[in-house]
Swiss-Prot record:
Annotated Gene Ontology cellular component terms: cytosolic small ribosomal subunit
GO BP term, example: translation
Name of the featured protein: Small ribosomal subunit protein bS6
HAMAP family, A to Z: Ribosomal_bS6
PANTHER family (UniProt xref): MITOCHONDRIAL 28S RIBOSOMAL PROTEIN S6, SMALL RIBOSOMAL SUBUNIT PROTEIN BS6M
Gene: rpsF
Gene3D superfamilies: 3.30.70.60
Composition bias, Acidic residues: 120-131
Length: 131
């Protein structure tokens, strides 16, 4: 079995269908003795350019280990599913399990926001105790 990185973009009006789609695709992979090494739902993001007059899409990234037959089946599903705007399947040399730069940046922003919130709450507590 080979390693693949799969990214697909879903129509923003169909975002509520994404969990079901992920479940269906991961079920097809694991049902054929494949493995899911990384699964990231990036959510709704701005597109770099318009696709079919759309400016946003729901992104999903998967790193999997699967046979060629399963990948062909997934590509066929992407092609005939009207909710999938674009998809890309790339073969990789090895399994990628670490978080993608998109998720790392999101976690970093969350940590900064929490640190800022903690600092401001400490300052307000210090201000309250001085009175």
């Amino acid at each position: 079995m080979r390693h693949y990185e799969i990214v697909f973009m879903v129509h923003p009006d169909q975002s509520e269908q994404v969990p079901g789609m992920i479940e269906r695709y991961t079920g097809a992979i694991t049902g054929a003795e494949g493995k899911i090494h990384r699964l990231e739902d990036w959510g709704r993001r701005q597109l770099a350019y318009s696709i079919n007059k759309l400016h946003k899409a729901h992104y999903v990234l998967m790193n999997v280990e699967a046979s060629q037959e399963v990948i062909d089946e997934l590509e066929t599903n992407f092609r005939y599913n009207d909710a999938v705007i674009r998809s890309m399947v790339m073969r990789t040399k090895h399994a990628v399990t670490e978080a993608s730069p998109m998720v790392k940046a999101k976690d970093e922003r969350r940590e900064r926001r929490e640190d800022f919130a903690n600092e401001t709450s400490e300052e307000t507590e210090a201000g309250d105790s001085e009175e």
